[in-house]
Amino acid sequence: MSFKMTQSQYTSLYGPTVGDSVRLGDTNLFAQVEKDYANYGDEATFGGGKSIRDGMAQNPNVTRDDKNVADLVLTNALIIDYDKIVKADIGIKNGYIFKIGKAGNPDIMDNVDIIIGATTDIIAAEGKIVTAGGIDTHVHFINPEQAEVALESGITTHIGGGTGASEGAKATTVTPGPWHIHRMLEAAEEMPINVGFTGKGQAVNHTALIEQIHAGAIGLKVHEDWGATPSALSHALDVADEFDVQVALHADTLNEAGFMEDTMAAVKDRVLHMYHTEGAGGGHAPDLIKSAAYSNILPSSTNPTLPYTHNTVDEHLDMVMITHHLNASIPEDIAFADSRIRKETIAAEDVLQDMGVFSMVSSDSQAMGRVGEVVTRTWQVAHRMKEQRGPLDGDFEYHDNNRIKRYIAKYTINPAITHGISDYVGSVEAGKLADLVMWEPEFFGAKPDLVVKGGMINSAVNGDANGSIPTSEPLKYRKMYGQFGGNITHTAMTFVSNTAYENGIYRQLNLKRMVRPVRNIRNLTKADMKNNNATPKIDVDPQTYEVFVDGNKITSEAATELPLTQRYFLF
């Protein structure tokens, strides 16, 4: 016996299905469902009178020993990922995603590959969007509270360096030396997110670099405040090649030790993560942006220049002065700061992100960037570029899937690949840690509904604890049980170099968290960047700072109004 319902009735019960489009927040972007794993009429839903009950969509006979029985299922989720926009159930077991498919009871339902049993909990994701937890690869570990702010924006992994509020940490993403690295690895035991630390990359003595990799650093940071010379960079890359770790570069703004071409000559054909490749965050003035054309450079933006607005240039001078410990009474310090800020290259940056020339977005937390705005600013750029440049190839009305996949890759899978952690995190795929962010569509990109970290709810919008229902005002983000007791040790990862892992750094420091090695880094090229691997010819006019791609000038207009702003953040 069949039952017919209208499309609007179906959507209100089970969320969108194939061909339906969902608007992302108050942006102009629409995600269209490409595939639905559901069998119409066999949808698994929880609640009074719903299907997930004993003997119905919940199997009464299975136990947790069955490998297909889930610990947790997110039902009828709209998954937005770098390679798919699909409607599916998400099965989680032992803290990992084990299946994207159809949940229910295979005894009475067809095509079930995620079994719901007595040991299964449910998160109702009907009508909601689920994305992979975001990855911020430019974090100054200045303040432990950054982790909570990031979680509440949809970020579940931090990579960078620092030791707290030292001048070194405030200016450079560096955790210098074995002693500091060990202390930060121990501090990470209580952080509710995944973390990895980068060591200081300035030393001609390889032993001084190698001891940091042995101590657990997942890479080296070369920063101009410590001296970003071609020599220092080359030595850091030598060690990185030996130990399969990444090098992140904040290049030489003043061109003291050479120009952009000299830096690239020192790099040779070795892979490198180029921080804030536009240059306002630091790097060869005025043409660092040209490095994004190289096939061995993995370029990222930091979020204060994204998107380009009428306020962007004005706010940057003070940020540079404070972050880099400059003195406003010294003319040379003012000149240094001023040389980094060029509206022409900033205006071009949004376009390069939209073309897939820039591959990643990060924060530069509390050091010329905002740790809670990586996700928001990424989608603001996507909105602005659709406004100014129209749909990408293959997109059309109510279908921005190609642009959406390009932009979500910038803070999920591509940072994971760049730093050797894509086997563990970065996408909604079977086998990966269940770091998932759930959004009401109208709040997408601004405020998540809840964050699942390693299979446990870690942070969620919830009401007054004395309320009679969970939605009693005030509704606000609250820590969930995933952050209490020993749960962090079972749901969050600490990333270390492979050599530190093999030498038992977790035993040496008595680390309780899941410790995992980074890997497969030194063989990367830009071709490995998902949906963001373009390598056109880039030129910068040395007088006007105008940017040209394959001979064509690129620029964007300064925004005076943006989505995902005051409408969402009045309270």
Curated annotation (Swiss-Prot):
The keyword Ribosomal protein does not apply. Its EC number is 3.5.1.5. CDD domains: Urease_alpha. It is an enzyme of class 3 (hydrolase). The active site is at residue 324. GO terms for molecular function: nickel cation binding; urease activity. Keywords: Cytoplasm, Hydrolase, Metal-binding, Nickel. Ni(2+) 1 binds at residues 138, 140, 221, 364. Residues 133-571 form the Urease domain. Coiled coil: none annotated. GO terms for cellular component: cytoplasm. Binds 2 nickel ions per subunit. Pathway: Nitrogen metabolism; urea degradation; CO(2) and NH(3) from urea (urease route): step 1/1. Carboxylation allows a single lysine to coordinate two nickel ions. The keyword Hydrolase applies. Ni(2+) 2 binds at residues 221, 250, 276. One of its GO terms (biological process) is urea catabolic process. It catalyses: urea + 2 H2O + H(+) = hydrogencarbonate + 2 NH4(+). InterPro entries: Amidohydro-rel, Metal-dep_hydrolase_composite, Metal_Hydrolase, Urease_alpha_N_dom, Urease_alpha_subunit, Urease_AS, Urease_asu, Urease_asu_c. Belongs to the metallo-dependent hydrolases superfamily. Urease alpha subunit family. Heterotrimer of UreA (gamma), UreB (beta) and UreC (alpha) subunits. Three heterotrimers associate to form the active enzyme. This is Urease subunit alpha. It comes from Staphylococcus epidermidis (strain ATCC 35984 / DSM 28319 / BCRC 17069 / CCUG 31568 / BM 3577 / RP62A).
